[in-house]
């Protein structure tokens, strides 16, 4: 709770828990925002929030496609969707014929990845998730062609089966040994997109995986690149327009895991770390 980053403040005892939300402006003293506007911002776990539009910490973004469900302002038309779009299109450079692998495929970002990759022309998209139920959801609701259950099968054997010629693009949400296994199977000029490393977030540095196959990036003339979504804020409106158009045409189908009632916020957070959620985890706190 005490760790401070460039984009998040530490929590003090009695603070409101942090979190982005979607809300309707009730009153505004800022000329850029009017009552009735629908915005995304760091509102915290509460039903009413007061945010400072002049403070970049709150990262306010006014939604433009409010005829679509407002829940999309936490999923596909928000950070999860923007992150998947940047990773697949701008860094992964997915194009017709590309073969794509996504880890953490059932999470908030992963649930957008297959739809976006296919909208860009990907030939095959394989997702990694934990458990038969979540893997079924990848194929039924998230656009994946193949789902690999890392809890119930040999991941390395499955990767060899589904990528006999190697992997073109790997969108990594997990890190650790899985990334090492993928590096052993990348094709020439592959792109590895580093989005997260949830397998190691709760580990001490001494417990981090020691990579053995990192040399293959140079050997295969590949590219590995990490990115931070808030470095791209000037493009958010354009990202929103692209994703909204895909939603309207059915190319992108937001997958959302919604709990009701502010009292369920702690449980929603637990679901995230336990991997229970399928799609973007959110809580509806008001009509």
Describe the predicted segments one by one.
Residues 122, 138-139, 177-252, 286-287:
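Glycine-rich phosphate-binding loop and adjacent beta-alpha segment
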Residues 28-32, 127-137, 151, 155, ...:
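Short glycine/proline-centered loop/turn elements that form peptide/ligand docking sites
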Residues 32-33, 94, 186:
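Short, well-ordered loop/turn sites that connect or cap secondary structure elements
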Residues 249-258, 266-287:
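C-terminal capping/lid region of NAD(P)-dependent oxidoreductase domains
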Residues 43-58, 235:
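A structural motif shared across PLP-dependent enzymes of the aminotransferase-like
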Residues 70-152:
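Mid-domain Rossmann-like dinucleotide-binding core that forms the NAD(H)/NADP(H) cofactor-binding site
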Residues 2-45:
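Glycine-rich beta-strand-centered segment in the early N-terminal region that forms part
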Residues 154-165:
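Short amphipathic alpha-helix with an adjacent loop that forms part of the alpha/beta core around
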